[in-house]
Amino acid sequence: MSNSCSTSSYPIRRKTPTRSGSNVNRNYVPSTYRPSICQCNQSNQSNQYNRSCHQTLPWYNKSNKPSFLDYKVNGSHSARKTCPSIPAKYHSPYTQCSGKCCC
């Protein structure tokens, strides 16, 4: 079965981070990262999506540090190759996972 996401060239929200450490915008994505973005169909979120991929775009943790690790809902970090649900406050809803889409 195909997964529930479609690849599209959706623009990444880019905002320049502020210099005051604690106010770095969590939606900031370095301009050098311009991969194809996956737009998920949230209403079809199920086991259909690819569980073997891992996110390749950075998300920002509570310390405003960019990280390429996967995000776990319980707040801990992991480099395991899964497609976690990434809260909007940490990351744009559009992510790319090793060339495949995940929700």
Curated annotation (Swiss-Prot):
Domain of life, per lineage: Viruses
Positions of the UniProt region annotated as Disordered: 1-28
Residue ranges with Polar residues bias: 1-10, 18-28
Record protein name field: Uncharacterized protein L586
